[in-house]
Amino acid sequence: MSDTNKEVVDLVWGRPSGGGVPASLFRRWSQGFVFSETERSALEQFEGGPCAVIAPVQAFLLKNILFNTEGLNWKDISEEEQRTVLCSTLSEILELACLNKSQAFHLVTWPHAKTTDNSDITDSHPEPESSQPTDTPTALATEELGFERFHSVIQKRTLRTVAELKEAVLSLYDTWKNKFGVLLFLYSVILTKGIENIKNEIEDTTEPLIDPVYGHGSQSLINLLVTGHAVSNVWDGDRECSGMKLHGIYQQASVGFLTLMESLRYCKVGAFLKSPKFPIWILGSETHLSVFFTKEMALVAPESASEQARRVFQTFDPEDNGFIPDTLLEDVMKALDLVSEPDYVNLMKSKLDPEGLGIILLGQFLLEFFPDQDSVIPDSFPVYHYNGLKQSNHNEKVSYVEGTALVMGFEDPMVRTDDTPVKRCLQTKWPYIELLWTTERSPSLN
């Protein structure tokens, strides 16, 4: 194993004691990008773990199919369209990870990888027919190639321009869909980003990107694929905590991220992930990632003045109390380019805090400076949910669950729907959302 490969292994898998990475964990991550036979634009996930890579790729894939490709029937794409859209999506994520477009891109692949069917590891390491049952998907790795052997044979390929990158990624389509495609792509993103750059962004460099016990991807890994930055947090910008600077998300993401952990008050997702450029959100449970999406672009309309005010106010309220000390009112008003003359600020303090409690409530602040604005969101619109695990789908066939969403500014008991993990996750963005699914059972977050 080369020094570079060892650095990648340490970053991704850590340095597990007692015999290295468990074979069962490596096997779960050893699959390629494979499209469902039932839903031709949906990727399948064979076992728990690699959703940290597959779900972000699926989210970008949907963005490109729904919004960047004219004349494409997103429910029925051809094999050639699958090839084109998957490879353009992988290239896009690699570009996102590259800090400077003048730097090189790196692809991790097999030595002398071919670009035709039956290529890659099968050529140089033939396996007995019995080791690969015919009914096993081609992207699920065999037991023949263990952890050490895999990392001793993979090689790095360097591309200097975006055009070269796109051409190379397209030519390696069979590599991405067969055997270890997910890991090869993940390693490509890591080397393109730069190992030291990732270490500088991760909060705790002793924590590997893949949990050595359960096999789940870390938040840093998810953020790296979604935003190009391997930061460990989901809030907007940087925060100070006990003299330490903790890094968050720096700009609006193309696809979003919402988590059930926020409904449990373990964290709070910032506006840059909660309000992405396209109406596609990765949903996180305690153990799995799925994708919620719609074609309704009104959901991601430019940030309104009141939404901006809410976001800025909350940066001064990091614990999400719903209020700030009145001493910070002037700073908030300055940040929003409101009149901030001392006399006016004092007048607003007395108006917003008539009882002299020394706090300014978020609701009162928004009501005073940004009275109710008409929502551009339609009363109802079609929505879809994707879960790549077969066992989490009806009849164990990976397909989108369709439904209708109602987003209201108040709770209406007349249209109250079941309380499900998917709904609780979405309520972190739309507190009064209701979901009516076309299936008998609601889609699974796990």
From Swiss-Prot:
It is found in: Nucleus. Keywords: Apoptosis, Hydrolase, Nucleus, Protease, Thiol protease, Ubl conjugation pathway. It is an enzyme of class 3 (hydrolase). It comes from the Eukaryota. One of its GO terms (biological process) is protein K48-linked deubiquitination. GO terms for molecular function: cysteine-type deubiquitinase activity; K48-linked deubiquitinase activity. Its EC number is 3.4.19.12. Signal peptide: none annotated. Residues 117-137 are annotated as: Disordered. Hydrolase that can remove 'Lys-48'-linked conjugated ubiquitin from proteins. This is Ubiquitin carboxyl-terminal hydrolase MINDY-3. Belongs to the MINDY deubiquitinase family. FAM188 subfamily. Its main location: nucleus. Gene3D superfamilies: EF-hand. Residues 117-128 have a biased composition (Basic and acidic residues). It catalyses: Thiol-dependent hydrolysis of ester, thioester, amide, peptide and isopeptide bonds formed by the C-terminal Gly of ubiquitin (a 76-residue protein attached to proteins as an intracellular targeting signal). The lineage of its organism: Eukaryota, Metazoa, Chordata, Craniata, Vertebrata. GO terms for cellular component: nucleus. The active site is at 51 (nucleophile), 288 (proton acceptor).
